[in-house]
From Swiss-Prot:
Lipid metabolism found in the keyword field: no
One Pfam family, short name: GidB
Cross-referenced SUPFAM superfamilies: S-adenosyl-L-methionine-dependent methyltransferases (SSF53335)
GO MF terms held by the record: rRNA (guanine-N7-)-methyltransferase activity
Provenance organism: Shewanella denitrificans (strain OS217 / ATCC BAA-1090 / DSM 15013)
Domain of life: Bacteria
Gene name as annotated: rsmG
Residue numbers binding S-adenosyl-L-methionine: 74, 79, 125-126, 140
Name of this protein: Ribosomal RNA small subunit methyltransferase G
Function according to Swiss-Prot or TrEMBL: Specifically methylates the N7 position of guanine in position 527 of 16S rRNA.
UniProt KW Ribosomal protein keyword: no
Family: Belongs to the methyltransferase superfamily. RNA methyltransferase RsmG family.
Gene Ontology CC: cytosol
Subcellular compartments: Cytoplasm
Length: 208
């Protein structure tokens, strides 16, 4: 059931996935559903809704990623990082979260589904100091763009991109972008079977 739904959603989004990738995406939903009963990783309870609200919602960003190395901050159970890693095996994803149970889940997913391009780090974002800066910083969890840029400013290299996944756009929030950063693009995202607003904001440090 999940497999056929996933195939239909991917086709609707013009995303192509191998049989292995589709199996990994379905496996991720099944593991999330199983672990959620004991560890309360998400408020979404049904696998069908997890597929739409978590996996497909995450994958809407996939066509807009540029670069090789990404960090997903406040990733929770691995969103959007794990679905994006499955669909982009040529890219590397660091999944950052401060809660141990979420990191344990991610590591189990990595082991069971054999996802080789993710690494999980248990840390608060402001305390994490990467040896090599990232091409992109991803977030779908931060309360505001301002918080994301303030707490994550040290993570990308000078030309790296901040990818903020948002629901409805808040004009006040957009006007409060901190000094030294610029909004490059606002992209309207369409998630299959989800009648809610979704946007991707691409930002970076001002150059020069």
């Amino acid at each position: 059931m999940l497999s056929s739904q996933l195939s239909a959603y991917l086709a609707e989004m013009n995303l192509s996935a191998t049989e292995q990738q589709q199996g990994q995406l379905v496996g991720f939903v099944e593991m999330l559903n199983k672990w959620n009963k004991a560890y309360n990783l998400t408020s979404v309870r049904s696998p069908e809704q997890m597929l739409i609200r978590h996996v497909m919602d995450s994958l809407t960003v996939s066509p807009y990623l540029s670069g090789k190395r990404f960090i997903d901050v406040g990733t929770g159970p691995g969103l959007p990082g794990i679905p994006l890693a499955i669909m982009n095996p040529d890219k590397e994803f660091v999944l950052l979260d401060s809660l141990g149970k979420r990191i344990r889940f991610q590591k189990q997913v990595q082991f069971e589904l054999k996802i080789n391009n993710i690494s999980s780090v248990e840390s608060r974002v402001e305390a994490f100091q990467p040896e090599i800066k990232f091409d992109g910083v991803l977030s779908r969890a931060f309360a505001s763009v301002q918080d994301m840029l303030t707490w994550c400013h040290h993570l990308p290299h000078n030309e790296g991109i901040f990818y903020a996944l948002k629901g409805q756009l808040n004009q006040v929030e957009l006007e409060a972008i901190p000094e030294g950063f610029e909004l490059l693009e606002t992209i309207v995202l369409q998630v299959p079977q989800l009648d809610e607003q979704r946007h991707l904001l691409k930002l970076r440090k001002k150059l020069g």
